[in-house]
Amino acid sequence: MERIVVTLGERSYPITIASGLFNEPASFLPLKSGEQVMLVTNETLAPLYLDKVRGVLEQAGVNVDSVILPDGEQYKSLAVLDTVFTALLQKPHGRDTTLVALGGGVVGDLTGFAAASYQRGVRFIQVPTTLLSQVDSSVGGKTAVNHPLGKNMIGAFYQPASVVVDLDCLKTLPPRELASGLAEVIKYGIILDGTFFNWLEENLDALLRLDGPAMAYCIRRCCELKAEVVAADERETGLRALLNLGHTFGHAIEAEMGYGNWLHGEAVAAGMVMAARTSERLGQFSSAETQRIITLLTRAGLPVNGPREMSAQAYLPHMLRDKKVLAGEMRLILPLAIGKSEVRSGVSHELVLNAIADCQSA
């Protein structure tokens, strides 16, 4: 069992990583007998895990209600968020309730925002079931829903009480979702840890076949890196922005193509190549390093080009609505070397458009 602590003073919390956690009531601490829980999941995961998690919580004496959401990025919306609030109010649940997010990034982000908002804030626990959510979205307290004009535009920073990562969930993950998660894994190597990137080049095949020790190390290392960044910059005023490598471009793809048509990790993968090409054009990143990124993403089964039907010009309106924009100016996360990156302002739109065009599908 791996255990990492996100250090945020009185709001610190543990990340527990192991197989078989859904069989152990102690996995869901700080829940105690007699407490009330609203378990939030989706229609795909409910048949797989809802009864199991409900059973282990009830075994611990916890009173469990549940709400089942539709599955898909397009449902990460205010309308679906309202169904969670309605379920909480109908029971009713008070300020002493705990929300448990059993799902991937959509369920986790939406449930976290519900917890941040309901009666001005209630406790919640992240139980991520996808690789992407296990290595990234469940850690750090970013919660949100999407708006038609932009991804994650309505949300809050709100930390969970704990994160429970059961590696067994990956056994039911479709290959496309596994690849999507690997995009965020590869991101950590590019922005923060060149040694980890080297390890990924050597061990990607083991991850693709869900080798237990390799996957446990991979998830632990990603969580360690994110925990360090979040502890240093919880509200993304500086260092934490680096975690958005590829996201400014990627969010534009998701919004333009319609949420759910490109998985988040797929859009981020293409966006990371666009960021690398931008850095190349600025003369601060080598084409050889870009090729290493492209090769690893391709081996993972991820796209390295933008959608054919999306022109370079179509990216700009979305990128100019990005949450990192300051005084109307884009701020891009750009690699300087494998394992090192920067936040860069003042890059001309023409250069960015040319970098995007470099990455358009033939």
Swiss-Prot record:
GO terms for cellular component: cytoplasm. Its main location: cytoplasm. The keyword Zinc applies. It is found in: Cytoplasm. GO terms for biological process: amino acid biosynthetic process; aromatic amino acid family biosynthetic process; chorismate biosynthetic process. Pathway: Metabolic intermediate biosynthesis; chorismate biosynthesis; chorismate from D-erythrose 4-phosphate and phosphoenolpyruvate: step 2/7. It is an enzyme of class 4 (lyase). Gene3D superfamilies: 3.40.50.1970, Dehydroquinate synthase-like - alpha domain. Its cofactor is NAD(+); Co(2+); Zn(2+). NAD(+) binds at residues 71-76, 105-109, 129-130, 142, 151, 169-172. Keywords: Amino-acid biosynthesis, Aromatic amino acid biosynthesis, Cobalt, Cytoplasm, Lyase, Metal-binding, NAD, Nucleotide-binding, Zinc. Binds 1 divalent metal cation per subunit. Can use either Co(2+) or Zn(2+). GO terms for molecular function: 3-dehydroquinate synthase activity; metal ion binding; nucleotide binding. It holds the Pfam family DHQS_C. This is 3-dehydroquinate synthase. The lineage of its organism: Bacteria, Pseudomonadati, Pseudomonadota, Gammaproteobacteria, Enterobacterales. The gene is aroB.
